[in-house]
């Protein structure tokens, strides 16, 4: 598990998506879309599983807790990473965001 500071609370506006990068314990770079909905934070892999497009450039749907790919419109659950609409059929990675004081941390868990 890798815990990386990704910024201060005020760096992440409400109803916004921010692209961040973090390096895990094995030296692999992860690009992650961090979404803020109200006081809740979500983090998913930033690349659409259907097209190699940045999800952080897409549309955030607060009420559905989904992030829509800007290329073909697949929406991904911010809670599970599962696609909610076609053409994507594979999930994207989900990570944890932790708030400590005014600092936000991204938790990357290594999967076997």
Where are these regions (language model features)?
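Flexible, glycine-rich terminal cap/loop adjacent to redox cofactors
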Residues: 53, 70-75
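C-terminal "cap" of GNAT-fold acetyltransferases
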Residues: 75, 89-92
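Positions that flank functional sites
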Residues: 63, 84, 91
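Amphipathic, hydrophobic secondary-structure cores in small proteins
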Residues: 57-59, 74, 83-86
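Cys/His/Pro-rich metal-binding microdomains
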Residues: 49, 67-70
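Short loop/turn motifs at secondary-structure junctions and domain boundaries
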Residues: 66-67, 87
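N-terminal pre-ligand scaffold of iron-sulfur
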Residues: 1-62, 78, 93-112
């Amino acid at each position: 598990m890798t815990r990386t500071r990704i910024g201060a609370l005020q760096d992440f506006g409400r109803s916004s998506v921010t692209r961040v990068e973090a390096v895990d314990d094995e030296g692999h770079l992860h690009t992650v879309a961090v979404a803020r909905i109200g006081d809740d934070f979500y983090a998913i892999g930033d690349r659409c599983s259907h097209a190699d497009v940045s999800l952080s450039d897409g549309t955030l749907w607060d009420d559905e807790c989904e992030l829509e790919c800007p290329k073909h419109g697949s929406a991904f659950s911010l809670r599970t990473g599962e696609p909610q609409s076609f053409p994507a059929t594979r999930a994207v990675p989900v990570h944890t965001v932790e708030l400590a004081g005014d600092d936000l941390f991204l938790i990357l868990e290594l999967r076997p």
